[in-house]
């Protein structure tokens, strides 16, 4: 299969829009001295701005060309791996983010399961995705299908359901236009919730 991301790597940061930094920091609970995994993080365009607010950032992606771009930014630790089979121990990361990438994962159920596995109890997972119920995103989904990118967009309801089934507490926000965020917290048995 043609690798669109290796081709786009040198210009990716120039053509892809900036993200909502303040919202991402709030949802992740940053600044905090935490270990952060940027799953599907590509060139590090998002995590390079989060790095100063954490103690360690690991970027996991399949595209070697994207990871080379990330390595050039400094402070980011690139790891080439499938998100469905992460090469990390259980309970390794305090925070995980997935920005505009979940729809590119081959098996989203397996990816979310493994992300929860490597998240520490009490840790947060934040997913930012285009809202496929919006007309503009439906058009993007069609274009990605025609480009043979293998994308599969999920609604936030579906993502929430998967995360609930994995035992996560969730919170959803949207920008009222075409982006949503799912924040999921892994229960911590040492700090029971009495609500």
What do the PLM-derived regions correspond to, one by one?
Residues 4, 8-9, 15-16, 46, ...:
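C-terminal alpha-helical "lid/dimerization" subdomain adjacent to the S-adenosyl-L-methionine
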Residues 16-34:
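Conserved alpha-helix/loop element of class I SAM-dependent methyltransferases that forms part
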Residues 33, 93-94:
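Local beta-strand N-terminus motif with an aromatic residue
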Residues 37-85:
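Class I SAM-dependent methyltransferase SAM/SAH-binding core
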Residues 97:
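A conserved beta-strand element that flanks and buttresses the S-adenosyl-L-methionine
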Residues 100-101:
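Short catalytic micro-motifs in class I SAM-dependent methyltransferases
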Residues 109-121:
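A short glycine-rich, Lys/Arg-flanked "PGG" loop and its adjoining helix->strand segment in the class I
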Residues 183-195:
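C-terminal lobe and adjacent flexible extensions of AdoMet/dcAdoMet transferase-like proteins
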């Amino acid at each position: 299969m043609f690798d669109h991301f290796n081709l786009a790597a040198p210009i990716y940061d120039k053509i892809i829009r900036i993200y909502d930094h303040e919202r991402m920091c709030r949802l992740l609970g940053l600044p905090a001295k935490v270990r952060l995994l940027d799953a599907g993080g590509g060139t590090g365009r998002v995590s390079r701005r989060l790095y100063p607010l954490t103690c360690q950032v690991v970027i996991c992606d399949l595209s070697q060309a994207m990871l080379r771009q990330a390595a050039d930014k400094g402070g980011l630790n690139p790891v080439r791996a499938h998100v469905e089979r992460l090469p990390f121990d259980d309970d390794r990361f305090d925070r995980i983010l997935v920005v505009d990438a979940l729809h590119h994962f081959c098996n989203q159920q397996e990816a979310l399961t493994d992300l929860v596995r490597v998240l520490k109890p009490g840790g947060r997972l934040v997913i930012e995705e285009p809202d496929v119920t919006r007309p503009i995103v439906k058009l993007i989904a069609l274009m990605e299908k025609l480009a043979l990118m293998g994308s599969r967009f999920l609604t936030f309801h579906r993502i929430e359901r998967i995360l609930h089934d994995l035992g996560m507490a969730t919170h959803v926000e949207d920008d009222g236009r075409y982006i949503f965020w799912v924040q999921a917290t892994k229960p911590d048995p040492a700090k029971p919730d009495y609500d």
